[in-house]
Amino acid sequence: MCIRDRLSTGLAYLIGNPNFDLMTGKYYARFHVKHQDSSDSYLRKAYTNLDLHTDGTYVKEKTDWIIMTKMEEQNVGGGESVILHLDDWEHLEDLSNDPVGQEDFVWGSPKSKNVDYKVEHPVFSKDKNGKPIISYIDQFPEPKNMKQGLFLQKLSDALEQSKNKISFPLPVGSTIFSNNYFWLHGRKAFKEHSGLSRELLRIRGTFFY
C-alpha cells in the first residue's frame, strides 16, 4: 500500500467506518480509466461524460461519505472533476418537492459491481433537520412506469444543465472528501489519446454516530 493509500485510508477511519466494496472485495477500490475499455462500467468510459450522481444508490449499506483520490495519470486532457451542492442547484425546490421523486424507485447494477440484488428507495428524502437529500445515479434506476421515467429525464437534464456546477482539474495526489447526501459528483469526458491512463482510489462509508 503506497503513501496515498495510507493517507486516504487513515482519513476514512478518522471520520467513520468504510463500507466493504463488493466490486473489489476490499474496503476500498482502485481502478484505471484508459483509452480502451471493455467493462460495463461508465466509470471507465473515458470519452463519455460521467454525469452528476451520488454513490451507493444500488446497495443496502448506507453511504454517508465518499473519498476520491487521484493516484496517477498520463497523457490526460480533459477529464475534469465536476461537483454540485444541492443548495446551489437552481431546481432543488421544484424537483425535491415533486411527489414522484419521493416514490420508491428500483435500483440495480451491472455485473461488474458484483451485487446480486436490487434495492428500492426514493430519489429525494429529508434529513433529520427536514432538509432535502438525494440518492441518485442516472445509470441504474429501473422506472416502474412512464411517470417515473419522465421524472428521471427531467432530473438528469436539470442537473447537467445547472449553471452552478463547479468544474476543476484535480491534481495528482489530491483528494475529494464529500458528504454523499448533498454533494453530487461527476467527470467531464477526456480528450482522446491512445496512451491515456488515470488511476483512482475510492473509499465509501458511514460516519460515526
Give each language-model segment a name.
Residues G16-K26:
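Short secondary-structure capping/junction motifs at helix and strand boundaries
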Residues M1-I3:
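Short, small-residue-biased leader/transition segments that mark boundaries at the very start
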Residues L7-I15:
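His/Glu-rich zincin catalytic helix
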Residues L14-P18, M71-Q74:
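Mid-sequence acidic-hydrophobic segments that form the walls
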Residues R30-F177, Y181-Y209:
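Active-site environment of non-heme Fe oxygenases that use a 2-His-1-carboxylate facial triad
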